[in-house]
Each structure stands twice: as structure tokens, then as C-alpha cells.
Amino acid sequence: MRIAVLIVLTTVLAMPASAQDTALHDPSISRDAQDGVIRLYGAGGPDTAIRKVADVWTKETGRKVEITAGPEKTWSKKAQGDADVIWGASEQAMTAFLETYKGFSSDQVEPIYLRPAVIAVKAGNPKGIMKFEDLLAEGTKIVVTEGAGVANTSGTGVWEDIAGRLGRLEDVAAFRSNIVAFEQGSGASFKAFKALDADAWITWPNWPLSNPDTLEAVPLSSDRAIWRDLSVALAPDADPDAKAFLDYLISDEAQKIMSREGWVR
């Protein structure tokens, strides 16, 4: 019996990473990316700034860019067939994408921008939240974004990275006791923030900047700051113009546009 168990364990451990297909991966889908349209797919959030860059580029070149964003399950099948570019809103998110989109590989991933996590509060900051420690007060209602092992989101683990930055367990415990919702995506977190009348949400700068009537950003101090990157992966069989668009996405003009939503290089 012990020998049989050992054989099974050895077989599992020896399986290559490529064999670890995700639930979304569909090997029956055939690819046809070179259709004259540059197609980018990824999580909601970065798309608002990327769209603005794409609009300028399209006006300058006449080349069409189609951007699809949101929960991965809503676009996965289409992306497996025609994605020229996949973007990841954090490294762990991009790594997870590579398990599903087999036409892309890790050596094709390029980090292009960074942004810091922020505390989003209600517009006008009625609770007067000015720093992380204010979130530890009893009764503060906090929303966090967390994939929980079932969703691919850039917010996974960010709240505990911030809470644990100084190596104080009591900070993590106090913060966790104030969490009123763990949501599996930033869009869902924003809805929960409003529905639950929460006081704070650990998120990214683009959300308060894109929703100034509802949200206001409170920056984290440097000793609490957590940064995540925006990375892109270009498919080997991508539309020929896709690389040109990615080059433009990091141009001086594009950097000005991206910076308005908190993205820096």
C-alpha cells in the first residue's frame, strides 16, 4: 500500500506545469488571431486607461483596437481563439492566465507599468480616514478584493501584505476583524462598498480616479505601500499590428495618459 501511494505521489509531482490545465482552458478551441483587429483581453481596471491610449492610437493610425475587460469567465473562450494580447493586473494574475491561454508563455510577458494600492473611502472622506492605522479602529467597515482560490484578481493578498508589512500580528488581526466583504474582483468590491455602506476599500488608484462622485483615495505611507504591476503578453501568432500598439502603449504620449489613472513607469 505504501509503495502504491509513493508511486501515485511521484507521478503527480512529476507532471509538467503545462499539464495543469485550468477549468477555463478548452483545448478544442482553434486560434485565428490575424483578422485585422488588435484584440486585448484582461481584468477590469486597467482597461479604462488602455482604452484612452487605444483611442488616440486609432485616430493616428486608423488601426482598430478592441479591448475586452472584466471577470475572466466572461471572455475566456473568445480570448483563447483570437487574443493578440493578454494583460495581467499583477504578476500572480498573469501567471494564472498563462495556465489557461496556452498560446502565451512566461518569456513573452513584459511588465510595463506599476501602481500602488490605496485606501478608497467615500467621497468627502466623512470618517476622516487619513492612514492605515485608522482602519484598525473598532467598527470600521472594510471591503477587500480576494480571489479566494477560485477567481483571478490582482487584489488577491494585497490587504494582508499591507496589514502585515510591519511584522505585527495584531495589525493583521485587527484589520481582518473589520472586513465586511471579501469580493472576487474589483468590480464586485466596488458594488459591495456601496451596498454595504462601507468605510474603506483596499484597491487601486484608477477606481477613485474613475469614480470621483463616489470614491476618494487616501494614499498609504511608504512603510505600508504595496505595488503591483501591469504586464502584457503578445501571442506568437498575433496580428502584425499588435506589437506596434504595445510599443505605443509605453510611449511618452501614452505614459501621460496612463499616469492620469495612477500608472507609472
Can you say where each PLM-predicted feature lies in the sequence?
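Ligand-binding cleft/hinge of the Venus flytrap
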Residues: 54-59, 132-183
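A ligand-binding cleft/hinge motif common to bilobed small-molecule-binding domains
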Residues: 91-100, 191-219
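Bacterial N-terminal signal peptides
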Residues: 4-14
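Short helix-initiation/N-cap motifs at beta->coil->alpha
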Residues: 44, 68-78, 170-191
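Short helix-loop capping/hinge motifs at secondary-structure junctions, enriched
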Residues: 123-130, 149-151, 168, 237-243
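Periplasmic-binding protein-like
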Residues: 114-116, 145-147, 209-246, 249-265
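N-terminal segment of the mature folded domain
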Residues: 21-144, 148
